[in-house]
Amino acid sequence: MRTRHLVGLISGVLILSVLLPVGLSIWLAHQQVETSFIEELDTYSSRVAIRANKVATQGKDALQELERWQGAACSEAHLMEMRRVSYSYRYIQEVAYIDNNVPQCSSLEHESPPDTFPEPGKISKDGYRVWLTSHNDLGIIRYMVAMGTAHYVVMIDPASFIDVIPYSSWQIDAAIIGNAHNVVITSSDEIAQGIITRLQKTPGEHIENNGIIYDILPLPEMNISIITWASTKMLQKGWHRQVFIWLPLGLVIGLLAAMFVLRILRRIQSPHHRLQDAIENRDICVHYQPIVSLANGKIVGAEALARWPQTDGSWLSPDSFIPLAQQTGLSEPLTLLIIRSVFEDMGDWLRQHPQQHISINLESPVLTSEKIPQLLRDMINHYQVNPRQIALELTEREFADPKTSAPIISRYREAGHEIYLDDFGTGYSSLSYLQDLDVDILKIDKSFVDALEYKNVTPHIIEMAKTLKLKMVAEGIETSKQEEWLRQHGVHYGQGWLYSKALPKEDFLRWAEQHL
């Protein structure tokens, strides 16, 4: 993946690393409050169901105890027994004795009005009859839950079924409805119209209506359902509390993640990784600076110079990134890339012009490489060019240790490559050991060409090269005066802006065709 794409990806990850923990913390706060809200609603429904079962069980126990009583119906002793049972069982409001569903007496009155009980709304599995009735001996219009056997009926206040403290962080209301006709038996607050029907259509699901969340718990054995609800306003308050807990944690995690991603981003944007990426993606290309004969101005070859295009349209020269490649162990892959590019660009041209050559620079770190000689052999065979057409340029640094460099240079020369000594004269020992170097061509550094008029060393270099029968290439020729001086002093070849700057492949080929 290209560095710029990777940088874009990691920049996106950086943004996510900050926003995601914060967003996640807000989401978790909301989820925790909502989960807690629903759990408390469900828990309250279950507690109301337990209470309803407890009340119903107490009613059954009271009826069983009344059925065991023996004596004259509606006598003082009988009335006292019914009053005792009504008093003893806390949820029982009244006890009535009936005969053929007609009340005869109750714990409140010696004689009851002869109002016949209707058919029960529900008969439980264990035979108890259940009504929702407003019948009582006091004449008060108030619905009560009646449970009965053949001879007794106990009246239970419906509010007893939902008389449960929520123990929650917010107000929860509850209602009990009769399943037969959806009649509200009791409710702690008014319930919205239509909610009962909607809840019965989606059992087990929660419904939100006008900022209120409803839950239903059917109790088919009692023919009732429990509905609980609470306002979401309290949910929002709880959410704000949780945000203050989760948000700082999310910010801390986000900042730590951002610091980690920034370290990765800085590393990827480092010069080392940028150069490595450029090599792997073949972003580094080769330009070619013509080398001409000073005798007739015709081209004899070119020096291959690496160029690294930048995103702003500029180019980096080798002086900018070759030292970096040497420091970071990228010299070998960079050199291999340049060699491949030279043959891909110039292989056909060299085959068509066997008198031309391309010189390639080799740096110290790659002299011992086994991959470079092998690649040169493979490319030469593939493009069918003469090894002499690929010259290798080495600086005097590469010759600093003759014991190491001599066998390597000898191997390249035996393979047919001419060896250029580049930047000659810039080091402290160059003149002293020139005669011991096994090279073919001496390149006179641009600094000596620039100072022809006031440096005496240049003529000495030229004379030494002549003595050793070395051909010479002068670099950095920019004026006709320099060209004339060099030609008069016997320098064979030259390169510089007087002739052409380093050119991309297509431009170079056009220039070369005009100067053959």
Swiss-Prot record:
Spell out the disulfide connections: none
Q: Where is the EAL domain?
A: 268-516
TM region positions = 6-26, 242-262
The protein's location, in the record's own words, is: Cell inner membrane
Q: Name one GO molecular function term.
A: cyclic-guanylate-specific phosphodiesterase activity
BP GO terms, sorted: regulation of single-species biofilm formation
User: Which SMART domains does the UniProt entry name for this protein?
Assistant: EAL
As for membrane topology, the entry says: Multi-pass membrane protein
Which reaction does this enzyme catalyse, per its entry? 3',3'-c-di-GMP + H2O = 5'-phosphoguanylyl(3'->5')guanosine + H(+)
| Top EC class for this record | hydrolase
List, alphabetically, the InterPro entries matched: CSS-motif_dom (IPR024744), Cyclic-di-GMP_PDE-like (IPR050706), EAL_dom (IPR001633), EAL_sf (IPR035919)
**Coiled coil (residue ranges):** none
Q: Name one Pfam family in it.
A: EAL
Give the enzyme's EC designation. Answer: 3.1.4.52
The UniProt keyword set, sorted, is: c-di-GMP, Cell inner membrane, Cell membrane, Hydrolase, Membrane, Transmembrane, Transmembrane helix
Q: Which GO terms describe its cellular component?
A: plasma membrane
Induction conditions:
Expressed during transition into stationary phase, at both 28 and 37 degrees Celsius. Expression is RpoS dependent.
Gene3D superfamilies linked to this entry: EAL domain (3.20.20.450)
Q: Which PANTHER family match?
A: CYCLIC DI-GMP PHOSPHODIESTERASE PDEB-RELATED (PTHR33121:SF81), CYCLIC DI-GMP PHOSPHODIESTERASE PDEF (PTHR33121)
State its role: Phosphodiesterase (PDE) that catalyzes the hydrolysis of cyclic-di-GMP (c-di-GMP) to 5'-pGpG.
What is the protein's given name?
Probable cyclic di-GMP phosphodiesterase PdeB
Query: What species is this protein from?
Result: Escherichia coli (strain K12)
